Amino acid sequence: MKPLKLNYFFIGIITLLLALALWPSIPWRSSQDVQLRQILSRGELRISTVNSPLTYAMSNGSPTGLDYELAKRFADYLGVKLVVSSRKNLDELFDDLDGDDADLLAAGLIYNHERLERFRAGPTYYSISQQMVYRLGSPRPKTLDKLQGRLVVTSGSAHAATLRDLKAEKYPQLSWESASDQSTQELLKQVADGKLDYTLGDSVTIGLMQRIHPQLAVAFDLSDEEPVIWYMRRSHDDSLSAALLDFFSQLVEDGTLARLEEKYLGHVGEFDYVDTTTFLSAIDETLPDLRPLFEKYATDIDWKLLAAISYQESHWNPLATSPTGVRGLMMLTRNTAESLNVTDRVDPEQSIRGGAQYMSHMMQKMPDTIPEDEKIWFALASYNMGYAHLLDARKLTEKQKGNPDSWVDVKMRLPMLSQKRYYTQTTYGYARGHEAYNYVENIRRYMVSLEGYLIEKEAKVQQQTQIALGYPAVPLTKVPE
């Protein structure tokens, strides 16, 4: 999969031009601001979305997701309460707009020119490419006229619109089926399971799905980079659109959009089939015995993150030993173990307890100016290459006009610490910054795989239990976008 492209300059320019075009004619706080006035009078911003870790989900009792966080910030910007409705499919989403049951659709939707006849597009907040997907091991098609099997896409989606355009322009013999009751994620899973030959997906969704279904493979791209947007009702009143454009312009300018996209999309780029399949096997074979210990001692971080750190360190091998002498599930040094009262580094419980305590200590060392949800990445980089070198990376970031408290800015400077023209300017000199960069990114990818795999596995168990008891099976929980 090619790396995700987040063109903030392009997004900022387009957003600014649109805002300037709208602002002189209809200021969003004028007497004509009907849509916005209704939201302010109601005291609520109503959004409809779909349930997935990328858009909106509950994690440890709190809502999370890129679209949720953006919507919450927009509601705060307007000074109103956010009300979220989760829907099953595209038809239900757009029905909410038609029926005035939602002000915005915030669901990671691709720009679809067919929808613009009835709905208005909001600003771009990241971009994707549409891709043809097949199952690894099957013949790889090179073009649309080389497909040999069933192609199914979600009805009403941008993928269906793309196929209609391509059929009219170049491939008159092209045929496919549309599924109104299945999401893109569900169709991708069918391809991974060998139940379907082909489907279309966006590069981000595919990249995340490959973390739990490594059998998914990209045959070719069907589009260049396309915008992901929110939708609102089309009307002569531009007040809500103008407010949204102004809001996103501020997010681009102050770096908030870049930080949120790093949080949810920054780990999507690279995919290693062998490493992923090995990790998924370890989840089934090794993790069940260790999970109670991770859950017991992960007091300051998610237990799945602690498990991902341990896998990166030792591949969950309690007897792991490195040439430098670090040992155990968390690969503790002798000095670190002694400071944490760990008497036996190869004892699983002692190692996990010590590792959790050490990570908590490292996070506490991070400056308060760093956002809470980013401190863990700084702490992990510090753990890998040393706190002093992390200080150098932050100073280098600031010197280059970046934000030393933003992980998206600092992580790009880590590899520079091994380049002479940069490390000669630092206080503590040369560091294997590229290793720290890869270390953190690997842990983030393991975390995504673990979360998605467990969600899907637990949903299957629930469904099988219901069938065994004679109850109708509920639909499986959607896997990560």
From Swiss-Prot:
Chief place of localization: membrane
Keywords assigned: Cell outer membrane, Cell wall biogenesis/degradation, Lyase, Membrane, Signal
Catalysis performed (reactions): Exolytic cleavage of the (1->4)-beta-glycosidic linkage between N-acetylmuramic acid (MurNAc) and N-acetylglucosamine (GlcNAc) residues in peptidoglycan, from either the reducing or the non-reducing ends of the peptidoglycan chains, with concomitant formation of a 1,6-anhydrobond in the MurNAc residue
Record-linked SMART domains: PBPb
Region described as LT domain: spans on this chain: 269-481
EC number, as in UniProt: 4.2.2.n1
Compartments it resides in: Cell outer membrane
Record Pfam families: SBP_bac_3, SLT
Active site: 313
Entries under Gene3D superfamilies matching the protein: 1.10.530.10, Periplasmic binding protein-like II
Protein's membrane topology: Peripheral membrane protein
Signal sequence segment: 1-21
Region ranges (Non-LT domain): 22-268
Cellular component terms (Gene Ontology): cell outer membrane
GO biological process entries: cell wall macromolecule catabolic process; cell wall organization; peptidoglycan catabolic process
Alphabetical list of InterPro entries matching this protein: Lysozyme-like_dom_sf, MltF, Solute-binding_3/MltF_N, Transglyc_AS, Transglycosylase_SLT_dom_1
Domain of life assignment: Bacteria
Entry's Gene Ontology molecular function annotations: peptidoglycan lytic transglycosylase activity
Family: In the N-terminal section; belongs to the bacterial solute-binding protein 3 family. In the C-terminal section; belongs to the transglycosylase Slt family.
Domain observations: The N-terminal domain does not have lytic activity and probably modulates enzymatic activity. The C-terminal domain is the catalytic active domain.
Known function: Murein-degrading enzyme that degrades murein glycan strands and insoluble, high-molecular weight murein sacculi, with the concomitant formation of a 1,6-anhydromuramoyl product. Lytic transglycosylases (LTs) play an integral role in the metabolism of the peptidoglycan (PG) sacculus. Their lytic action creates space within the PG sacculus to allow for its expansion as well as for the insertion of various structures such as secretion systems and flagella.
Designated name of the protein: Membrane-bound lytic murein transglycosylase F
Chain's gene name: mltF
